Amino acid sequence: MPLVVHKYGGTSVGDAERIRNVARRIIAAKDAGDDVVVVVSAMGDTTDDLIKLAYQVTDTPSARELDVLLSTGELVASTLLAMALKGMGHEAISLSGAQAGIRTDSNHSKARIMAIDPARVKSELGAGRIVIVAGFQGIAQDSDVTTLGRGGSDTTAVALAVSLGARACERYTDVEGIYTADPRQVPEACKLKEISYDEMLELATYGSKVMHPRAVELGQIYGMPILVASSFNDNRGTLIHGGHMEIRNKVTAITADTDVAKITIVGVPDRPGIAAGIFGSLAKAGVSVDTIVQNASIQGITDLSFTVSKGDAGKALGVVEPLAQEIGARECVADTSLSKVSIIGTGMQNTPGYAATMFDTLFAGGINIQLITTSEIRITVIIAGEQAAEAVKALHKAFELEKE
């Protein structure tokens, strides 16, 4: 039988009635002729609640024990869903990440999937069961439970779909698909029928919370189509794939990310090796750096700015401040009140005018640009955090995305 992997987010399984609703959707897919493997997230705000509880017990929870704790959220959801399916007369079984054969590295809270042994899942499918897999987790070589980081259930689902040779991975959530902008910010935003892996990866990396970037990367590498749709209705969703789509000479979507902090090292001596030392030390500390800008040198002195997530700002300062003193820089300054706004679209390649329209629109709205970064299909600006929603609305109108 053809196989499909469903993934349901925390909102979709947020209470008993929603779990029963998901069970009915799974049964419909099974009745339509598909074998079904399901990946679930933890119910509602369970993960956040467990993190808060851990920090109430101790200010420094063990990374290993925190992973074990957080993995229980998905176990609860998967077992309840299996119970609901059995209550509706269908054979089903819940599996932890370890039982489903998901092997990871040992990097607690940010583990990466190294391999999947699908033998147990295939065996259960062969016995006619619907298989429910707890997302977001796996097991390391030392047999410790690991978690994949926030949004990791998406990665679990796509990785399982690839390893099982599924025809598609379908991600069901509380939105109907991928939009030209966040519809909560821009009511005129339009749902896209399809989007390329490249565009979706940029969207996911630069602010869209609908798909996790690592899941999109996996889909792109292995050519696994991913459908994003609502678990609350049967409306058509958005297909993420690598097919030959019509090249539109326009922006596809606009996204914003308010989880941005900028670190500036003022008065850096302009000599070889300093940037390597700074960013090498940040990498060793586990700090992920995004935009990097170095000013032109004046009399052998320059300023170096880079962005990190707000949660990493303190750690980044702790790394660079001693280095700044060591190299004779004047000071380190942090700004945690910023946001990234991006325009994204494959139609932007080799076509002039997009940057000019973007910058003119922001200027007309009195929005100051602090930093700029680009790729072949993206232009991103760093602006004041409180102006992000205003910038997205203005750019959505400027590029006429309401006509999509």
What would you call each of these model-derived segments?
Residues 1-216, 307, 383-384, 399, ...:
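Nucleotide/pyrophosphate-binding catalytic subdomain
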Residues 32, 88, 222, 285, ...:
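Conserved dinucleotide-binding and phosphotransfer motif residues
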Residues 43, 175-177, 222-226, 230-235, ...:
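Glycine-rich beta-alpha junction loops
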Residues 168-172, 226-228, 290:
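Short hydrophobic alpha-helical runs that function as membrane-insertion/retention elements
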Residues 219:
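Acidic-aromatic/histidine active-site loop/patch
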Residues 237-404:
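A conserved regulatory-domain signal marking ACT and ACT-like small-molecule sensing domains
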